[in-house]
Amino acid sequence: MFYWLQKNLPRIVISPSFAVILWFVYGFILWTFYVSFTKSKMLPRYDFWGIEQHFRLWSNPRWFNAVENLLIFTVLFVVVCILIGILLSILLDQKIRAEGFLRTIYLYPMALSFIVTGTAWKWMLNPTMGIEKLVTDWGFTDFTFDWLVSREMSIYTIVIAAVWQSSGFIMALFLAGLRSIDDEIVKAAKIDGASLYSIYITIILPMMRPVFMSSIVILLHISIKSYDLVIALTAGGPGTSSDMPAVFMTQMAFHRSEIGLASASAAMMFLTVLAVVVPYLYSELRRQDANS
């Protein structure tokens, strides 16, 4: 008995945590999927209604607006974060004197929550007290920067704030990847007469495919579940012009008493995350098997 207890002690210790996670994470994921197929309104109902909630979801103009905003936000957020991250990591990879200080500055935004980031950028982008007022006070009276209150441009203010917060983290990922590359490869390329630009473009960056993939997956995950930054910065406005799926889901569940519709939108978001993560995990496992 003592031998069995000693052998299985790690399993016994983690089993309560495992059970809690299994119930409160995966159990509620399954519950959400089930509720999305019911007539649930203010309170959950368990009478099966087929895919009517999903039909209602995809016939809702506000949901289409949220999905369109998500596509705009995701493309710009991922591309700009990776470009800035690569440029900053290459800069720091040159062994400059102020590397430690600059690395701290670039990474500092990641220490803030998206709520703090959204609030700070809301102040800066406010036409009556932010960048626009500062520039007009300098004498440039024709200058306008009212994206925060513009229905057409408000989604781009979310992109600006999100890129500011996340690009430093991407820089850290790429810098770690650059520092893991053997210096002999770079020295050999320089001996062959390759310029620094061609070394990075044709040799180093292609070797960093795992970093690219990891960065893309992380950024896609952040963009799909974007909620707190949107609420703090624009609250989905003006009107619903900067709505995102997570904001739509919360509004339907807690303000419109549409639990079934909110569950359908949550199911769509979850399936989107799976569509991003599963192929990545599959490709990484295949690559590891090939290397072994």
Model-derived regions, located:
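A structural signal for multi-pass alpha-helical bundles of membrane permease subunits
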Residues: 3-292
